Regions:
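Short acidic/histidine- and often glycine-rich active-site loop of Leloir-type glycosyltransferases
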Residues: 570-581
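Short Ser/Thr-rich beta->loop micro-motif in glycosyltransferases that lines
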Residues: 370, 540-546, 564
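A conserved nucleotide-sugar
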Residues: 317-319, 479-509, 514
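Donor-sugar nucleotide-binding helix/loop cap in glycosyltransferases
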Residues: 539, 553
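Charged active-site motifs of nucleotide-sugar-dependent glycosyltransferases
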Residues: 286-289, 455-461, 488-489
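Substrate-binding clefts and catalytic carboxylate motifs of secreted carbohydrate-active enzymes
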Residues: 462-473
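Short alpha-helix at the nucleotide-sugar/activated-sugar donor binding site of glycosyltransferases
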Residues: 554-555, 578
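Alpha-helical solenoid repeat scaffolds of the TPR/TPR-like class and their adjacent stem/linker regions
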Residues: 1-454, 466, 476, 505-512, ...
Length: 642
């Protein structure tokens, strides 16, 4: 019979090799005779944590601490559980206790640094990462985490350096490849390099959270559809199995399923569910105090849409604050500052400091204009910074969190029967949910089709939506339309050279010559709006419609042909068209969509009639009367706090 010491050493060896279940069985066997061994209890608790059985893990770690209150490892282990459950403050308390017992405890310092980063205590987080570097300068994990921190601080070049150093120190660090890939994809638009990093990460750990969705979304930006169907099928299966496989925003552009959207968004935020909601007493402010939180107070679609709302607010009834959480500042930032009672850059202060500031300013309503999009900082709202918290405009879907009281929409983008797919209470505007400027300056420079590389006597189909919105199915539909309309071309927005080449190759496979697909470079807003008018018919994408690009087309007098689906993002163009009296351009299947596009291209008088319709102010007033829109929005705010 083996001695307890031999069994214990065997169990530890199995544990180190990753055979957690086998090690656990031996630990349990040993515990029967060694019930007061705090180290054994710690190791046993750790096996449960590794199997995500946090309740059982915490139970054994609590016993370990009770037996030996000076056992640093058990405090650190329990801290890990708290962090996994989203209880970062409790986690930090345990890490602090572990460090007080064992000053040079690397794991506890590293875990504390990560927890501090997760609650946006960035400066304190940096201090503990620096301690970790001193303790272990060759540890790949530290540099990976420093990369994450710099990404949070919007220091993207520095973040890239840290991820690269992490990979240099450990070629098998899947997380570092994954994180660098995401950085390259989102902040550098280096999609090819991002895909390579995602591939490297997958080879090391094929079950890494969200890796499959990130890779497919990056490939969509390049129109790389070679394995599209197979990859999408895997993602759909993993969603059914409640796996973290795709981010909510990426899901929107691929799958038209609002129920599934709610499920994956709630899964994405599951660590924040355990944070207790606190009842905030309604304020007694003389004015209703609104805080608009956005990463887009610069030259961005959300800024273009919201500018007149900020300008038109009734300052005798409302006090409005702009909270900037994004890294970019430009002339649009300077322009909008003057419309707020106060404009505050909070991009480099902690969530706790933002909560204190919000409390000091006595916010009645906090509006999230960014949602689950680029540079989001939704952790701010988990601190409940106002009595009422609202999801509006920046993200066309549910936030998937009980921390939001309302989503502002209209009855087309969220019909009554779809309210169940939103964690927020849906509150409706009477017309289109989308804010718009009443007038936008358009370049007065004389220009013609030739100036933009367009043929003079061809029918111009156009779509200026982002590349990732173009799916193989919708592109095939467009090629079917071009086949039937020989005297036509398709005008698209060029995001990168490889995307253009891939799209030409796809067109060739479908029997369309590349000279019938033309690309436009990105231009400043004034010049961009000038060229939009040369489109004869805007062909919309599906399942992620044109949103800002749709209202831009309408403003330029260009009719839009759209497909209406079930999800919010697949119904936005339908809402816009309904509000300008062009419901006849809304379709629910590709066959009818194609038929109508072909019919219109062969009947230019009808196109002229549609364009004339869009030049009449009476048809556009619902969409572009920003003063009336702001009054409707203010009625909602009053209702929210009543």
């Amino acid at each position: 019979m083996k001695s307890d010491e031999v069994l214990f050493n065997e169990a530890k060896a199995l544990h180190i090799k990753g055979k957690v279940k086998n090690a656990q069985e031996i630990y349990l066997q040993l515990l029967k005779k060694n019930s007061n061994n705090s180290n054994l209890l710690f190791l046993l608790g750790t096996t449960y944590v590794q199997q995500k059985n946090y309740q059982k893990g915490k139970e054994y770690l609590n016993i370990s601490i009770k037996i030996n209150s000076n056992f640093a490892e058990s405090y650190n282990g329990r801290g890990v559980i708290f962090a996994e459950e989203g209880e970062y403050r409790n986690a930090i308390k345990d890490y602090d206790k572990a460090i007080s017992l064992k000053k040079d405890y690397f794991d506890a310092n590293l875990n504390k640094a990560v927890a501090l980063r997760n609650i946006s205590e960035f400066n304190e987080s940096i201090k503990h990462f620096e301690i970790c570097i001193k303790l272990n300068p060759n540890d790949s994990k530290i540099y990976n985490n420093l990369g994450n921190l710099c990404k949070n601080l919007k220091k993207y070049n520095t973040a890239k350096k840290y991820y690269t150093e992490s990979i240099r120190l450990n070629k098998n660090n899947a997380e570092a490849y994954n994180n660098r890939g995401e950085l390259l994809q989102i902040h550098f638009n280096e999609f090819e390099k991002a895909i390579q990093d995602f591939d490297n990460a997958s080879k090391i750990n094929k079950d890494l959270d969200y890796i499959k969705g990130k890779k497919l979304h990056a490939k969509m930006s390049l129109h790389d559809w070679n394995s599209y169907n197979g990859e999408l099928k895997i993602i759909k299966n993993e969603i059914k199995n409640k796996k973290k496989t795709i981010y909510p925003f990426a899901h929107m552009s691929l799958i038209d399923d609002p129920g599934q959207q709610k499920t994956i968004t709630e899964l994405y935020l599951e660590n924040n569910r355990s944070i207790p909601l606190k009842q905030i007493i309604k304020s007694t402010n003389n004015k209703i105090i609104i805080g608009y939180f956005s990463a887009e107070f610069h030259n961005h679609a959300v800024m273009h849409l919201m500018l007149d709302v900020f300008k038109n607010h009734n300052k005798s009834e409302f006090k409005i604050y702009g909270f900037s959480i994004g890294p970019k500042k430009d002339e649009w930032t300077e322009k909008v500052k003057g419309y707020f009672d106060e404009f505050i850059d909070v991009s480099h202060i902690s969530d706790t400091e933002i909560k204190s500031l919000s409390k000091k300013l006595k916010l009645d309503i906090a509006i999230n204009l960014t949602g689950h999009t680029l540079n989001a900082r939704n952790s701010i709202f988990f601190n409940q910074i106002a009595p009422k918290q609202v999801n509006y405009l920046g993200y066309p879907g549910t936030m998937g969190s009980k921390f939001y009281d309302y989503i502002i929409a209209d009855k087309i983008v969220i019909p009554e029967e779809n309210r169940k797919y939103f964690s927020e209470e849906v509150i409706y505007l009477p017309n289109c949910y989308q804010a718009n400027q009443e007038k936008i300056e358009i370049s007065n420079k004389n220009s013609n089709k030739k100036d933009f590389g367009l043929p003079k006597n061809k029918f111009i189909f156009g779509c200026f939506n982002n590349s990732y919105k173009i799916t193989p199915l919708i592109f095939k539909s467009w090629m079917n339309i071009l086949k039937r309309c020989e005297n036509s071309i398709l005008w698209l927005l060029q995001d990168n050279k490889l995307a253009k080449l891939n799209l030409w190759e796809e067109a060739k496979k479908l029997g369309i010559n590349k000279d019938r697909i033309l690309f436009a470079e990105r231009l400043p807003v004034k010049e961009h709006l000038k060229r939009v008018k040369f489109i004869d018919l805007f062909l919309d994408t599906f399942p992620y419609n044109a949103h800002t690009t749709a209202s831009e087309a309408i403003r330029a007098g260009v009719p839009i042909l759209t497909l209406k689906g079930k999800s919010f993002p697949s119904r936005v163009a339908s809402s816009i068209l309904t509000n300008v009296g062009l419901e006849k351009l809304i379709f629910s299947n590709l066959e009818d969509y194609e038929t109508e596009a072909i019919s219109l291209a062969k009947n230019y008088k009808e196109i002229e009639s549609l364009k004339k319709h869009l030049t009449q102010d009476k048809n556009l007033s619902k969409l572009f009367d920003s003063k009336a829109f702001t009054k409707d929005l203010e009625k909602i705010y009053k209702k929210i706090i009543s």
